[in-house]
Amino acid sequence: MVARSEDYKEALKHQASGRLADAQKICEDILKVQPENPDALHLLGVLVFQLNNPERSIDLINRAIEIHPDNADYHCDLGIVQAALGQLGAANISYDKAIAIRPEFAQAYNNRGLVQAATAQSESAIESYNKALEFIPNFAAAYCNRGIAHTQLRKYELAIVDFNKAISIQPRYGEAYCNLGFVQERIGQPNVALENYNKAIEILPNYDVAYYNRGNVLKSINKHSAAINSYEKAMQIRPDFPFLSGTLLHTKMEICDWEDLEAHQNALLSQVEQGKKASRPLDLHNLFDSPSLHKLATEAWMQSKHPRNTSLGEITKKPICNKIRIGYYSADFREHAVSHLSVDIFESHNRNKFELIAFSYRPEVNDGMYKRVQGAFDQFIEVRNQSDLDIAKHSRDLGIDIAVDLGGLTSGQRPGVFSYRAAPTQVSYLGYGGTMACEYYDYLMADETIIPREHQNYYSEKIVYLPSYQTSALHRARAQKKLTRQELGLPESGFIFCCFNNNIKITPSIFSTWMRILEAVEGSILFLNASNAVAIENIKKEALSHRINPDRIIFKKFLPRAEHLATYGIADLFLDTFPYNAATTANDALWSGLPLLTLVGKSFVSRVGASALNVLQLPELISYSQAEYESRAIELAKSPAQLVAIRKKLQANRTRSPLFDPKHVTKYIESAYIKMHEHYRSALPPEHIWIAED
């Protein structure tokens, strides 16, 4: 036995020095002589886990526990392996057993906190970290982990205190610097966040998460090229970094960097089709006209980031009320496209039948749109510092009947709120063009152009078919004066094609089409939005590669909204992007009397332009192939009489179209809400709903 004890100590030394195979050999030799030696079984279990054989590790540690069930270390290490395998419930039980055996076991409390945080039990996790710190007051990892839990609960000030405490205990704590940077980015301190990401990378040069986070903050301050470099470094360290392939490609598209785009697209396509965590769903919308692909990517995202959570239990059916209580949830109750499209709906709701409550994810902003939206609701609740769980609880406490997500998977939104079932009926509308691909969104509002009946299988939700998918106010802001070509930097003559979509929506394919159109229409120019300086330079280079003088592409500077709307009066034809069409921008153009030529595809976002044109009864502006789109643009530019006739038709139709009649569209939406609520009250499952035009 003595010899074996010495051998065991030698194995521990090898393990501490990283000589895992040597340590494994010694443990196996011990077990040949003493097959029931629990310490050797336990250590061998730990070693094979370190050598990437977790299944065998569990078997070995369990054997050790059978022999010596009152060893807290065995249970704690078993929990570590179980957690690594995703067996979080089992891991939690193992940590509880370790704590029951040794109530002062700080590491077990810390590890249990990690499992609780991973299962959306952040408050319980904080209690576990508090216990760990009670027994080891200078436990840096527990401070760091508690900071992460506070971050999950959006208690950012407490998180910052925890991360700084962890760093004061362990000054070379790279993970704590990275987490501190993440919180600083969240509270609007990108430059300070950048410093902390750089510090994390200095300490841990191969820290992939720090490179990824640094890329995010660089992108947020319009340093796209530096962001790309940081993303590429993260991917070099970890080629399968979750969802990074799409983010990297999306960032390149933001600056119109199309080098090797086709090869990158094909690689990304393959990853998504294999069910890998390859891309955020929104990053695919301007790259692929494929609703099936969009659904696959969204399923991977939602299962990873926002799985269904039943911790609040079923919603108790409340007594019938005189009014249906509608909750609208958004990060965009401000000067934003979503508010431009929705504020008139809020104001037009029938308050005898509906009560409206807003849940705003963003802090108050000092702009007219925020105040207008705020005034349109019966209650306007700022929930930016509440956790997803707390917002869902709040929604239930208020008795929300129908929860309407106005943002989906766009920036700053909170689909996690809906994962807890904030209301009996949950709806996606307006801000996000695609399926949420999960079981807890019941309905998606669209129209028959956007989602034909034969496309329903690409959507997890039941479809609400409105006569008009979107609407905007008749009484729009107007410029105080009429702008001239000269004021906008445009030549005094020549046909003006325009596209005021964000540059990220421009693909090499559609740009090549535009260049052929310019080549065919002598003296014509292309008037584009200017998203960023790098994009402008890259677009000019692309024009040269198509043998088009870059001076024929004029970039519009930022203008106040009223003056921006006036620029549509200068242009002759709006060329839509594909596969990601214009939405609010299309409505602005059409209301201003500017014809919009669109190319229709299969995906939600590639059919929005056609939706608006069909509602306006202008099918002659819808193209079904790139060749048709190109020839039609050239034809209209060379046929002034035909274009004048289309303008007259547009001007006549817009005044009687639901596209510009929010009161009418609100009635359609209210009819849909009533049908949804009737289904719920009758204990019927959601089903497709068609709202007839009156």
Region spans (language model):
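Alpha-helical solenoid repeat scaffolds of the TPR/TPR-like class and their adjacent stem/linker regions
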Residues: 1-491, 502, 512, 541-548, ...
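Conserved hydrophobic helix-helix packing surfaces used for dimerization/oligomerization
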Residues: 324-328, 497, 526
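A conserved nucleotide-sugar
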Residues: 353-355, 515-545
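Substrate-binding clefts and catalytic carboxylate motifs of secreted carbohydrate-active enzymes
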Residues: 498-509
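Donor-sugar nucleotide-binding helix/loop cap in glycosyltransferases
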Residues: 575, 589
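CoA-thioester-processing core
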Residues: 608-609
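A eukaryotic nuclear recognition-module signature that targets compact all-alpha binding cores
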Residues: 612
